[in-house]
């Protein structure tokens, strides 16, 4: 993507328009025409930046992926940071449900898993390379992604705070397991 500030502003407007369009219905019911109307850009401008609505939604979710990685590695109160992140996810649940399946698959699920795995592996290796680091890093990523996906799709009950506490407990247990 371009570093041009005008392009960044256009992408930000498209992201906001997408979240606005999905405020009361799922991503699958939203059209490019509606998003471009809300963002006040042409279809041609849309397609200069994104291939389709799914690509726009993944782009709009990039900040969520960074925030998730940071939340799991917060130095202060990780469960509280995770609860805040889950609260933010629930505000745009219609977008995120369209990008992450109930089992954690889909473009957002894959992005979350990959980024979380990479960061967990880096953090574990700061302490020294251990046999099983790759497995633990993958398990941490899968746990976070799977629980968040299950919660988004109504398969994991609880408030953002309760689910954050459960995720944190599982992640800590995984890191202690080898």
Give short role names for the model-derived ranges:
Residues 1-3, 43, 73-90, 94, ...:
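Primarily secretory-pathway and cell-envelope proteins
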Residues 1-8, 127, 177-178:
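N-terminal intrinsically disordered/low-complexity leader segments
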Residues 8-19, 23, 28-32, 37-40, ...:
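An amphipathic alpha-helix adjacent to DNA-recognition modules
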Residues 18, 60, 64, 68, ...:
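Hydrophobic recognition helices of helix-based DNA-binding modules
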Residues 30-31, 97-99, 108, 160:
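Short, hydrophobic secondary-structure boundary micro-motifs
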Residues 71-75, 99, 124, 151-155:
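Secondary-structure edge/capping motif, primarily at the C-terminal ends of alpha-helices
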Residues 83-84, 103-146, 161, 165, ...:
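Amphipathic alpha-helical packing segments from all-alpha helical-bundle domains
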């Amino acid at each position: 993507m371009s570093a041009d500030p005008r392009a960044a502003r256009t992408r930000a407007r498209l992201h906001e328009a997408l979240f606005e369009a999905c405020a009361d219905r799922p991503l699958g019911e939203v059209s490019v025409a509606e998003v471009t109307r809300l963002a006040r850009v042409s279809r041609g401008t849309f397609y200069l930046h994104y291939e389709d609505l799914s690509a726009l939604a993944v782009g709009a979710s990039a900040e969520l992926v960074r925030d998730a990685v940071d939340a799991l590695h917060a130095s202060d109160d990780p469960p509280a940071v995770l609860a805040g992140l889950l609260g933010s996810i629930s505000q745009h649940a219609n977008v995120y449900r369209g990008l992450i399946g109930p089992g954690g698959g889909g473009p957002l699920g894959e992005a979350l898993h990959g980024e979380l795995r990479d960061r967990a592996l880096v953090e574990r290796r700061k302490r020294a390379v251990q046999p099983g680091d790759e497995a633990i890093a993958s398990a941490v990523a899968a746990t976070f992604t799977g629980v968040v996906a299950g919660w988004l799709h109504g398969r994991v009950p609880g408030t953002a705070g309760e689910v954050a506490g459960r995720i944190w407990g599982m992640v800590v247990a995984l890191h202690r397991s080898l």
